[in-house]
Amino acid sequence: PKGVMPSTQGNPNRLNEDKIMFGVSASINVESENESTNDTRVGVEFAMLKNKLYLGAEAYYMNVGFTDRQKINESYNYLGGYVQGGYFVAPRLQAALRYDFFNRNGTGDDGFLNMPAVGMNYFFKGCNLKLQAMYQYIARTGHDTQLDRDNDNLGLATHSATVMLQYTF
């Protein structure tokens, strides 16, 4: 509604923007060789840039239906999403927060992944280079018992830190 939304989550050269975006998406993926799954995905999205502030959120639903060849009669439904924000605390330094959630076991089973994260982005001047650092905590919640929660691990790290150098062109 306020013009074209730039495809960025913040840019130190565009700190006077006032943009907003709403989106709806849907897709149906049909397995052509009848080997795996037929999937339906639906989502909604929001993003906003207002001066030094960036906000974004997305929610999605997915239905996974197995083909006859897979010999699995069940279909599974999943919900997930995220909320994130960034704010330029200095001319080239952006602080960021993010919260993801996902019920990777399907809506029929208890258990959610909750993934809060904190990060910083530093934008180098005049070279389209960005240094990103993020810490993320992965929690498993909503299980019936502590044993169910412990068994729903799959080797996921509880704590992770990522540092990335990104060049755009």
Show which residues each predicted segment covers.
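Outer membrane beta-barrel transmembrane domains
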Residues: 82, 86-140
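Outer-membrane beta-barrel "beta-signal"
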Residues: 120, 124, 129, 153-169
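Transmembrane beta-barrel architecture of outer-membrane proteins
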Residues: 39-41, 78-80, 113-117, 158-162
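Outer-membrane beta-barrel proteins, especially TonB-dependent receptors
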Residues: 8-17, 25-27, 31, 140-141, ...
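Residue-level signal for short segments within beta-strands and strand-turn junctions
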Residues: 61-63, 122, 137, 167
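Detector for outer-membrane/organellar transmembrane beta-barrel domains
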Residues: 1-105
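Extracellular loop and loop/strand-boundary signature of outer-membrane beta-barrel proteins
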Residues: 68-72, 104-107, 143-153
